[in-house]
Amino acid sequence: MDIIKLKHITKRYDDGFIALKDINITIESGKFYSLLGPSGSGKSTILRIIAGFTQPSSGQVFFDGKDITDLDASKRHINTVFQNYALFPHLNVFENVAFGLKIKKKPLNEIRPAVKDALHMVRLDGYANREISELSGGQQQRVAIARAIVNEPKVLLLDESLSALDKRLRKDMQFELRAIQKKLGITFIFVTHDQEEALSMSDEIFVLNDGQIQQSGSPVAIYDEPVNDFVARFIGDSNILPGRMIKDYVVEFANNKFRCADGGIKSNEKVEVVIRPEDLDIVAPEKGKIVVTAQTQLFLGDHFEIKAIDANENEWLIHSTNGVKLGQRIGLFFDPEDIHVMRLNESQKDFDARIEKYEGDENED
């Protein structure tokens, strides 16, 4: 069931800067969504428009089928957890979580059990009387979430809310947030510039750049089938090479022809080829589909990151559990399914239509 729809949302500021360009988004109830993109891509502006803190220049916002474009933020069934958590330092944990309920003039006999349940949900039982200054960053994060969910919103918005935490705590909170969302069964919309956060937590991701949605879909679909160069480079590490489509299932790059899993592209059309570094296997040069020379190598704990160059001066990034010697000639082996072919300047709409048509033609055969 759809809970939020943005239709043709544009945001233009007085200085002429266009933050959002014809944004169309559908959010289903009970799922975890991420708005992912670099700084200035428009992701936080979308969040603020959904929350009611910012008005769009044009377009409509729908909530449960009703137009709420002009509805005051306080009247929306939506709560927000901000990047700095916005906790009140002069109030203890209980008072922070209870704040919204007190504003609504709820009686104390309703507030106490509601706050207790919210703190239990975020695993902060026994912390009600703690001062905010006594809490770690992760605990403050959970208090902010408890304060938001105690109001029983239908949608929870989180604006870069893990960015202030250290790497280990950020990883722990990814599991925590996903678990909380599953328990509550409400819609989470999470804004981040961190691809790992988006990939690990989301049911669906919207990738933004320059005020436009570049691609939307499941984490697996976006990682395995980026629609353009920006998405391929922004989501994970990639080897991206210029190529030419020979025919269905055959593509040429690095002066060789290779079997691939892509079709529906014109013969001789210029394309870009994406191969993820973890899909490259290091083999003996005579067994490799491509031969490269190792240039640099970093040990990253669970794998080596190797940069190499082929005879055509193409650079290759390889992730391997085995290291190599610098200057060593090595073979790279990959399967047809490891090759992803991208058309130049193809939109997601055109990409989806091509795949649907091509797969439909295959089924008829």
Swiss-Prot record:
Assigned EC number: 7.6.2.11
Location of the ABC transporter domain: 4-235
Molecular function via GO: ABC-type putrescine transporter activity; ATP binding; ATP hydrolysis activity
CDD domains linked to this entry: ABC_PotA_N
GO cellular component: ATP-binding cassette (ABC) transporter complex
Membrane topology type: Peripheral membrane protein
Quaternary structure annotation from Swiss-Prot or TrEMBL: The complex is composed of two ATP-binding proteins (PotA), two transmembrane proteins (PotB and PotC) and a solute-binding protein (PotD).
Protein's UniProt name: Spermidine/putrescine import ATP-binding protein PotA
Gene: potA
